[in-house]
């Protein structure tokens, strides 16, 4: 996959790839206020516990923590953990809702990117990993590090 020079990763959810098997990915817009955009551009967002829910034919992102903007007054600042509307096509919402309801999967945000001036969320349709799967991933990562270390020493 070619790297697009117009796309810049602002916030990454590295924990999601460790705790879940990502089956599919989608890109969605997010309905944000001005102070939220400023905080995200400064990298002051946390995707750790965030997830998507589907209600009334709309997709909502819950538990996305965006810190209040430093220079804005408290009157104009936003609620850090309010739910935010995800902007997806109707077919995408219906497909994601079907996967979540039937197969017991979940939708988690993987990262927030700046794409041509717009903040987008990369969402992953995910299945939770079991404890032994997580241990296996740690073992594989350690063996890869050891192999790289050996190759570097040569």
From Swiss-Prot:
InterPro entries in UniProt: SmpB, SsrA-bd_prot, SsrA-bd_prot_CS
GO BP term, pick one: trans-translation
One GO cellular component term: cytosol
Keyword flag Cytoplasm: yes
Record region (Disordered): 134-154
Superkingdom in the source lineage: Bacteria
Molecular function GO terms recorded: RNA binding
Stored Pfam families: SmpB
Keywords of this entry: Cytoplasm, RNA-binding
UniProt-annotated location(s): Cytoplasm
Family from the record: Belongs to the SmpB family.
Role according to the record: Required for rescue of stalled ribosomes mediated by trans-translation. Binds to transfer-messenger RNA (tmRNA), required for stable association of tmRNA with ribosomes. tmRNA and SmpB together mimic tRNA shape, replacing the anticodon stem-loop with SmpB. tmRNA is encoded by the ssrA gene; the 2 termini fold to resemble tRNA(Ala) and it encodes a 'tag peptide', a short internal open reading frame. During trans-translation Ala-aminoacylated tmRNA acts like a tRNA, entering the A-site of stalled ribosomes, displacing the stalled mRNA.
Official protein name in the record: SsrA-binding protein
Gene assigned in the entry: smpB
């Amino acid at each position: 996959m070619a790297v697009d020079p117009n796309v810049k990763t602002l916030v990454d959810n590295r924990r999601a790839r460790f705790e879940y098997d990502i089956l599919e990915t989608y890109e969605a817009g997010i309905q944000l206020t001005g102070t939220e955009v400023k905080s995200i551009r400064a990298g002051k967002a946390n995707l750790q516990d965030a997830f998507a829910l589907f209600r009334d034919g709309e997709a909502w992102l819950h538990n996305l923590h965006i810190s209040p903007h430093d220079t804005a007054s408290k009157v104009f600042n936003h609620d850090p953990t309010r739910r935010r509307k995800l902007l997806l096509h109707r077919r995408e919402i219906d497909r994601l809702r079907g996967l979540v309801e039937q197969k017991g999967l979940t939708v988690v945000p993987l990262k927030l990117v700046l794409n041509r001036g717009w903040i987008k969320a990369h969402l992953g349709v995910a299945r939770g990993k079991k404890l032994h799967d997580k241990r296996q991933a740690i073992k594989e990562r350690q063996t890869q590090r050891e192999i790289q270390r050996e190759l570097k020493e040569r």
